[in-house]
Protein backbone atom coordinates (compact mmCIF):
# COMPACT_ATOMS: atom_id res chain seq x y z
CA UNK A 1 0.00 0.00 0.00
CA UNK A 2 1.22 3.48 -0.84
CA UNK A 3 1.19 5.93 2.04
CA UNK A 4 1.40 9.69 2.16
CA UNK A 5 4.58 10.06 4.26
CA UNK A 6 4.45 12.77 6.93
CA UNK A 7 6.09 13.82 10.17
CA UNK A 8 4.76 15.31 13.39
CA UNK A 9 6.81 16.68 16.27
CA UNK A 10 5.97 17.86 19.76
CA UNK A 11 8.61 20.20 21.12
CA UNK A 12 8.70 20.07 24.93
CA UNK A 13 9.66 22.82 27.37
CA UNK A 14 8.84 23.38 31.06
CA UNK A 15 6.08 20.75 31.13
CA UNK A 16 4.46 22.10 27.95
CA UNK A 17 4.15 21.02 24.32
CA UNK A 18 4.44 23.54 21.50
CA UNK A 19 1.06 23.31 19.79
CA UNK A 20 -0.10 24.81 16.49
CA UNK A 21 -3.69 26.08 16.40
CA UNK A 22 -4.56 25.71 12.70
CA UNK A 23 -6.58 28.83 11.93
CA UNK A 24 -4.85 30.62 9.04
CA UNK A 25 -5.21 28.41 5.95
CA UNK A 26 -8.40 28.17 3.91
CA UNK A 27 -9.79 24.72 3.07
CA UNK A 28 -7.61 23.14 5.76
CA UNK A 29 -8.63 19.63 6.89
CA UNK A 30 -7.06 20.57 10.24
CA UNK A 31 -8.91 23.91 10.57
CA UNK A 32 -9.38 24.91 14.23
CA UNK A 33 -7.56 21.78 15.44
CA UNK A 34 -4.53 21.92 17.71
CA UNK A 35 -1.65 19.84 16.35
CA UNK A 36 2.10 19.50 16.65
CA UNK A 37 4.37 20.80 13.91
CA UNK A 38 5.37 18.81 10.88
CA UNK A 39 4.32 18.04 7.36
CA UNK A 40 4.76 16.05 4.19
CA UNK A 41 8.01 14.57 2.91
CA UNK A 42 9.59 16.39 -0.01
CA UNK A 43 11.23 14.32 -2.78
CA UNK A 44 14.41 12.63 -1.56
CA UNK A 45 13.73 13.28 2.15
CA UNK A 46 13.64 10.72 4.90
CA UNK A 47 11.66 11.21 8.11
CA UNK A 48 14.46 12.97 10.01
CA UNK A 49 15.22 15.42 7.20
CA UNK A 50 11.52 16.18 6.82
CA UNK A 51 10.86 16.84 10.51
CA UNK A 52 13.98 19.00 10.84
CA UNK A 53 12.92 21.12 7.85
CA UNK A 54 9.27 21.38 8.87
CA UNK A 55 9.99 22.38 12.48
CA UNK A 56 12.35 25.12 11.31
CA UNK A 57 9.93 26.35 8.62
CA UNK A 58 6.93 26.45 10.96
CA UNK A 59 8.58 27.66 14.18
CA UNK A 60 11.96 29.24 13.39
CA UNK A 61 13.52 26.80 15.88
CA UNK A 62 16.27 24.29 15.08
CA UNK A 63 16.04 20.92 16.80
CA UNK A 64 19.25 19.53 18.25
CA UNK A 65 18.22 16.06 19.42
CA UNK A 66 14.81 14.92 18.15
CA UNK A 67 13.63 11.59 19.56
CA UNK A 68 11.92 9.20 17.13
CA UNK A 69 8.83 7.93 18.95
CA UNK A 70 7.24 5.68 16.33
CA UNK A 71 4.93 5.39 13.36
CA UNK A 72 1.20 6.02 13.28
CA UNK A 73 -0.79 4.85 10.25
CA UNK A 74 -4.07 6.60 9.46
CA UNK A 75 -6.80 5.19 7.24
CA UNK A 76 -9.61 7.73 6.87
CA UNK A 77 -11.81 8.09 3.80
CA UNK A 78 -11.75 10.24 1.67
CA UNK A 79 -8.06 11.03 2.40
CA UNK A 80 -5.18 8.82 1.27
CA UNK A 81 -3.62 6.44 3.77
CA UNK A 82 -1.01 8.34 5.79
CA UNK A 83 2.11 7.10 7.55
CA UNK A 84 3.09 9.65 10.17
CA UNK A 85 6.54 9.53 11.78
CA UNK A 86 6.19 10.87 15.32
CA UNK A 87 8.94 12.77 17.14
CA UNK A 88 9.43 14.68 20.37
CA UNK A 89 12.24 17.09 21.13
CA UNK A 90 13.48 18.83 24.27
CA UNK A 91 16.64 20.40 22.84
CA UNK A 92 16.29 23.17 20.31
CA UNK A 93 17.72 26.61 19.59
CA UNK A 94 16.64 29.84 17.97
CA UNK A 95 13.85 32.36 18.30
CA UNK A 96 10.28 31.29 17.66
CA UNK A 97 8.67 33.01 14.66
CA UNK A 98 5.09 33.39 13.46
CA UNK A 99 3.67 30.44 11.54
CA UNK A 100 1.77 30.90 8.28
CA UNK A 101 -0.51 27.95 9.15
CA UNK A 102 -1.76 29.10 12.55
CA UNK A 103 -0.86 30.28 16.02
CA UNK A 104 1.94 28.64 18.01
CA UNK A 105 1.42 28.32 21.75
CA UNK A 106 3.10 26.48 24.64
CA UNK A 107 0.34 24.38 26.23
CA UNK A 108 0.71 22.49 29.54
CA UNK A 109 0.84 18.75 28.76
CA UNK A 110 -2.11 18.01 31.05
CA UNK A 111 -4.27 20.56 29.14
CA UNK A 112 -3.65 19.20 25.63
CA UNK A 113 -6.41 16.56 25.86
CA UNK A 114 -8.93 19.35 26.56
CA UNK A 115 -8.16 21.13 23.29
CA UNK A 116 -9.92 20.33 20.01
CA UNK A 117 -7.40 17.73 18.79
CA UNK A 118 -7.98 14.80 16.47
CA UNK A 119 -9.51 11.79 18.22
CA UNK A 120 -6.67 9.58 17.00
CA UNK A 121 -4.08 11.94 18.51
CA UNK A 122 -5.54 11.32 21.98
CA UNK A 123 -4.34 7.72 21.75
CA UNK A 124 -0.69 8.52 21.13
CA UNK A 125 -0.63 11.43 23.61
CA UNK A 126 -1.28 8.86 26.33
CA UNK A 127 1.67 6.83 25.02
CA UNK A 128 4.01 9.84 24.92
CA UNK A 129 3.57 10.53 28.64
Segments from the language model and where they lie:
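A short coil-to-beta-strand element that immediately follows conserved catalytic motifs
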Residues: 62-70
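Active-site-adjacent beta-strand/loop module that shapes the phosphate/pyrophosphate-binding cleft
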Residues: 74-95, 105, 109, 122-128
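Short connector loops at helix/strand junctions that flank enzyme active sites
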Residues: 4, 31, 36, 63, ...
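Conserved Nudix-box catalytic region and its N-terminal flanking loop in Nudix hydrolases
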Residues: 17-57
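Conserved N-terminal beta-strand and adjoining loop/helix that marks the start
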Residues: 1-19, 40-41
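Short, charged/polar surface micro-motifs in flexible loops or helix N-caps
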Residues: 12-16, 25, 42, 90-95
Amino acid sequence: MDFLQTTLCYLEKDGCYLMLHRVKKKNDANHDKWVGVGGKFEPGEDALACVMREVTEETGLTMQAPAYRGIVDFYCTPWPAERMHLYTCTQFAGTMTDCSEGTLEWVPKQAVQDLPIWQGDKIFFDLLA
